[in-house]
């Protein structure tokens, strides 16, 4: 999932470590979030939204490739 975390963090002059301390997570977690290797849990997404005073959907953006195409149907489940 794409996100604006790096931009928001840098606008505040914070390092990844400083943001991690604010959130109660590791610096590695912040790095993984910023690079899109990790999607946040819902509680973490809410903490980020409160911290940056923005709606979650203005911080996180679904990957276009991950979105099902309009009119597409889910694949049938194997039985």
Regions found by a protein language model. Give the residues of each.
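Short, charged recognition helix plus adjacent turn
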Residues: 60-79
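Short basic helix-loop element that most often maps to the first helix and adjoining turn
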Residues: 3-22, 74-77
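Recognition helix of helix-turn-helix/homeodomain-like DNA-binding domains
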Residues: 25-38
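Residues in the recognition helix of alpha-helical DNA-binding motifs
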Residues: 8, 22-23, 33, 62
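DNA major-groove recognition helix of helix-turn-helix/homeodomain DNA-binding modules
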Residues: 43-58
């Amino acid at each position: 999932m794409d996100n604006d975390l790096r931009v928001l963090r840098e606008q505040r002059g914070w390092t990844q470590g400083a943001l991690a301390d604010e959130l109660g997570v590791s610096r590695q977690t912040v790095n993984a979030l910023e690079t899109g290797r990790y999607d946040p849990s819902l509680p973490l997404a809410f903490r980020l939204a409160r911290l940056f005073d923005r709606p979650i959907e203005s911080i996180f953006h679904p990957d276009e490739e991950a979105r099902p195409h309009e009119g597409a149907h889910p694949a049938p489940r194997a039985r």
